[in-house]
Amino acid sequence: IGTSPSVGVLVMPAIYQAVKQHAPQLLIRNVPVTDPETQLAQFQTDLIIDGNSFTARALGHNVLYTDTLALVCRQAHPALSAPLTPENLRHYEHATFMSEGQGQDPLRQRIDELFPDRPISFSSYNMFTLAALIGSSDLLCIMPVRLFTLLQKCWPLESIPLSQLTTESIEISLHYNKLSLRDPVLENVINVIRQTF
């Protein structure tokens, strides 16, 4: 099952428990996602759980859950003592999460429209690196709420309540090669994962 580290930490514990209950003989491997469409099309991995959408017709997907977004800063950040408007928040540098091999996605475009002139001074493919940096600087970052809830247990992070983000969300989906459904074991695993979420 391919995931990024930040998605894996949120979904793999529940998947492991559910799969072990239904198919205890299976070895579950969590592998990195490098080129999701190729990995699935060439059967390099059976499943990928990701927030991206793919266009290949040979691939199927099921939405596992939808997560809202939060604007995150360190505790006692100076922005928390000023009116929380996009204009005031543009004065602070932002960090951004980037997925490998991902082009311009609609969610990123909407965030860019919300903060059109935000200065981005750091980007990383690793949410844990971003959280550590945000917790020790004045950077701001937009991230999924479930991930923020987990990361704030490790770093001194706080969510900035911003009404403009309340309608934005990200879908985390299970992706697979449709031909994989011919394998009854894999089809069962896919069904177990769907039911878990």
Kindly give the residue locations of the regions a language model identified.
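Secondary-structure junction motif
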Residues: 10, 79, 84-86, 93-115, ...
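Central regulatory/effector-binding core of bacterial HTH transcription factors
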Residues: 1-55
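Beta-alpha-beta core module
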Residues: 57-62, 67, 128-178
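Short helices/loops that flank or line small-molecule/ion binding pockets
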Residues: 34-45, 87, 127-138
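Flexible hinge/capping segments at coil-to-helix
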Residues: 56-98
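Short, well-ordered beta-strand segments
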Residues: 1-2, 48, 72, 95, ...
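A late-sequence structural motif
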Residues: 11, 86, 158-197
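A local structural motif
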Residues: 21-29, 112-122
